[in-house]
Amino acid sequence: EICACLVGSEMCIRDRSYCYYPWFYYYKLIGNANAIIENIDNASGSNEEKLFIKAQALTFRAYSYMMLSQLYCHRWCDSNNGSSRGLPLRIDLSTGELPTSTLAEVYGRIYEDLNEAISNFTASELDRSSGDNYSPNLDVAYATYARAALTREDWATAARYAVLARANYPLMTNSEYVDGGFNTPNQEWIWSSYNATDQNLHYYSFFAYQGSNSSASICRTYACSISKELYDQIPETDVRKNMFLGPKEGETYTTSTGRASKGALYDRAMKDYADKIYSTSYIFAYMQFKILCADQPGIGQLNNFRSAEMYLIEAEANCHIGGKDAETQKLLVALNKDSGRNPAYTCTKTGDDLLQEVKLYRRIELWGEGFDWFDYKRWKEPIVRKSYPEGSFHIQFAITIQPSDNNQWTWVFPAKEVDYNDALSSYIE
């Protein structure tokens, strides 16, 4: 998400790591999954264990192709119903030249893998250990299905699997939300990526780029902040508003940089958020305190799926299905009021106004978790970056990025893939 937000809709140089690392990473997962899928039947162990492990591998493969398609393929609404260029679909251990499949064929493979994974998980009657949130299980397959279907604009399928995915994961409490709810698995987390003191990425981790309490220099000197435009739309009664340092009356900051080096805003930050700031951190207006590292410099488990996203997937899908305004209103009330995030929340909106409400609360609830760029791409909506005086970006980044800009936000295939896979020669952008 960091790479996508910074360069994904503006530039993508074929031989730079920003472009090729996601390709390498997800195809590495796919290759490992293929090895398991091809060989698990001949491994030792019970049939139930084999079914469970194969289901996990299929889920990893489906998840990886879903992520790759969002980066390296056109958004579904621009794909001519999936007939546009997709990805090389490697589903075995062969390494020869391989042309791309269509985007529809990519999603067909994702669905097929998840259907088989769900069947195998169910037949195995096994589940992961309670502490192994990083290990895929049946609910992870459901969640992957829900997100993939949403991205494909398969609304009924997205809603169906979102309900199944969240069934065993109640929304986190307010105390969990504001204190470590995004670096350590809790009751709401469906699936996460493991990271701990004995196995971590040090200064390359997500939390070493975004954690407000991280000792990493990028976090101490350039704090991640919410846009003023979004902050102002969060109700005062909403606990999520307290996750950001919004200036109050009489609190000032340097509008050319966003920094507050002294004064009332600085003093309040150092007092009210002392346990969420590294001792030498710079203070910025609208800086975030939602994403915290569990240990230095950037240790923390990275959430991949949680129940809140599933509520929002079902709500968005309902808006497109039509005739489900009442159900969608109830979903938003459950997420915002019943959870305790905003006890004063109500929703009576209908039609397109209701869809816009869902989109707004998707931005609020999932802020900082890696969704904005992907959402704006699939929504086919412009990203509007405002300058520091308006509470957001440095002036040179304060631009508007249209959905049609830069190859419709579609990343180019990495040079290494094109150089060694001659079957892709006709697909060079």
Locations of regions flagged by a protein language model:
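Von Willebrand factor type A / integrin I
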Residues: 185-186, 213-218, 224, 228
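Acidic/polar-rich alpha-helix caps and helix-coil junctions
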Residues: 17-207, 232-429
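Single conserved hydrophobic/aromatic residue that forms the stacking wall/gate
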Residues: 1-8, 13
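Acidic-aromatic pocket-rim loops
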Residues: 201-220
